[in-house]
Protein backbone atom coordinates (compact mmCIF):
# COMPACT_ATOMS: atom_id res chain seq x y z
CA UNK A 1 0.00 0.00 0.00
CA UNK A 2 2.99 2.30 -0.30
CA UNK A 3 2.70 5.33 -2.60
CA UNK A 4 -1.05 5.45 -2.00
CA UNK A 5 -3.19 7.98 -0.24
CA UNK A 6 -6.46 7.67 1.60
CA UNK A 7 -8.64 10.78 1.49
CA UNK A 8 -11.44 10.94 4.05
CA UNK A 9 -14.19 13.57 3.77
CA UNK A 10 -16.51 14.07 6.73
CA UNK A 11 -19.83 15.94 6.77
CA UNK A 12 -22.08 16.67 9.73
CA UNK A 13 -24.63 19.18 10.95
CA UNK A 14 -23.09 19.32 14.45
CA UNK A 15 -19.53 20.66 14.64
CA UNK A 16 -18.83 18.88 17.93
CA UNK A 17 -19.61 15.48 16.42
CA UNK A 18 -17.42 16.07 13.39
CA UNK A 19 -14.50 17.30 15.52
CA UNK A 20 -14.79 14.26 17.78
CA UNK A 21 -14.83 11.94 14.76
CA UNK A 22 -11.80 13.61 13.18
CA UNK A 23 -9.77 13.24 16.37
CA UNK A 24 -10.69 9.54 16.54
CA UNK A 25 -9.61 8.99 12.93
CA UNK A 26 -6.34 10.92 13.33
CA UNK A 27 -5.44 9.14 16.58
CA UNK A 28 -6.19 5.74 15.04
CA UNK A 29 -4.10 6.46 11.95
CA UNK A 30 -1.15 7.79 13.95
CA UNK A 31 -1.31 4.83 16.33
CA UNK A 32 -0.87 2.43 13.40
CA UNK A 33 2.14 4.31 12.05
CA UNK A 34 0.63 6.27 9.14
CA UNK A 35 1.41 9.86 8.28
CA UNK A 36 -1.64 12.12 8.58
CA UNK A 37 -2.31 15.51 7.01
CA UNK A 38 -5.22 17.38 8.48
CA UNK A 39 -7.92 17.68 9.61
CA UNK A 40 -8.48 20.49 7.13
CA UNK A 41 -11.69 22.46 7.76
CA UNK A 42 -13.55 23.01 4.50
CA UNK A 43 -16.06 25.86 4.07
CA UNK A 44 -19.29 25.46 6.01
CA UNK A 45 -22.38 25.38 3.80
CA UNK A 46 -25.24 27.48 5.15
CA UNK A 47 -28.72 26.84 3.77
CA UNK A 48 -31.35 29.39 4.76
CA UNK A 49 -35.09 28.85 4.48
CA UNK A 50 -37.72 31.56 4.84
CA UNK A 51 -41.25 30.42 5.69
CA UNK A 52 -44.45 32.44 5.93
CA UNK A 53 -45.90 32.18 9.43
CA UNK A 54 -49.42 33.30 8.58
CA UNK A 55 -51.46 31.10 6.24
CA UNK A 56 -53.54 33.95 4.81
CA UNK A 57 -52.39 37.55 5.29
CA UNK A 58 -49.45 39.27 7.03
CA UNK A 59 -46.77 38.83 4.41
CA UNK A 60 -44.30 40.48 6.79
CA UNK A 61 -44.58 37.71 9.38
CA UNK A 62 -41.90 35.18 8.44
CA UNK A 63 -39.60 32.75 10.17
CA UNK A 64 -36.08 32.02 9.00
CA UNK A 65 -34.27 28.74 9.56
CA UNK A 66 -30.70 27.77 8.83
CA UNK A 67 -28.94 24.44 8.36
CA UNK A 68 -25.15 24.44 8.58
CA UNK A 69 -23.21 21.57 7.02
CA UNK A 70 -19.69 21.35 8.46
CA UNK A 71 -17.01 19.55 6.44
CA UNK A 72 -13.53 18.24 7.22
CA UNK A 73 -10.84 16.64 5.06
CA UNK A 74 -8.18 14.20 6.26
CA UNK A 75 -5.37 12.79 4.10
CA UNK A 76 -3.54 9.66 5.22
CA UNK A 77 -0.36 9.74 3.16
CA UNK A 78 1.39 6.43 3.78
CA UNK A 79 -1.21 3.95 5.03
CA UNK A 80 -0.23 0.48 6.17
CA UNK A 81 -2.37 -2.65 6.26
CA UNK A 82 -2.89 -2.07 9.99
CA UNK A 83 -4.15 1.44 9.25
CA UNK A 84 -6.79 0.23 6.80
CA UNK A 85 -7.95 -2.51 9.18
CA UNK A 86 -8.16 -0.08 12.12
CA UNK A 87 -10.12 2.47 10.07
CA UNK A 88 -12.58 -0.19 8.90
CA UNK A 89 -13.22 -1.25 12.52
CA UNK A 90 -13.62 2.32 13.75
CA UNK A 91 -17.12 3.12 15.02
CA UNK A 92 -18.02 6.78 14.44
CA UNK A 93 -21.02 8.84 15.53
CA UNK A 94 -24.32 8.32 13.71
CA UNK A 95 -24.65 11.92 12.53
CA UNK A 96 -21.38 11.95 10.58
CA UNK A 97 -21.26 11.13 6.86
CA UNK A 98 -17.93 9.55 5.85
CA UNK A 99 -16.62 9.33 2.28
CA UNK A 100 -13.36 7.44 1.71
CA UNK A 101 -11.43 7.52 -1.55
CA UNK A 102 -8.13 5.90 -2.50
CA UNK A 103 -5.76 7.80 -4.71
Curated annotation (Swiss-Prot):
Function: Involved in the binding of tRNA to the ribosomes.
Subunit organization: Part of the 30S ribosomal subunit.
Source taxonomy: Bacteria, Pseudomonadati, Pseudomonadota, Gammaproteobacteria, Enterobacterales
GO molecular function, one term: tRNA binding
Organism the protein comes from: Buchnera aphidicola subsp. Acyrthosiphon pisum (strain APS) (Acyrthosiphon pisum symbiotic bacterium)
GO BP field: translation
PANTHER family, per the entry: 30S RIBOSOMAL PROTEIN S10 FAMILY MEMBER
Superkingdom per UniProt: Bacteria
Protein name, entry field: Small ribosomal subunit protein uS10
Keyword terms of this UniProt record: Ribonucleoprotein, Ribosomal protein
Pfam families in the cross-refs: Ribosomal_S10
Cited InterPro entries: Ribosomal_uS10, Ribosomal_uS10_CS, Ribosomal_uS10_dom, Ribosomal_uS10_dom_sf
Assigned protein family: Belongs to the universal ribosomal protein uS10 family.
GO cellular component terms listed in the entry, alphabetical order: ribonucleoprotein complex; ribosome
Gene: rpsJ
Statement: the UniProt record of this protein carries the keyword Iron: no
Amino acid sequence: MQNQRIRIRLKAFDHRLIDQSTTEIVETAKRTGAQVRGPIPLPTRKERFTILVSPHVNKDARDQYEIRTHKRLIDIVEPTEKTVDALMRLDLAAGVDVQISLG
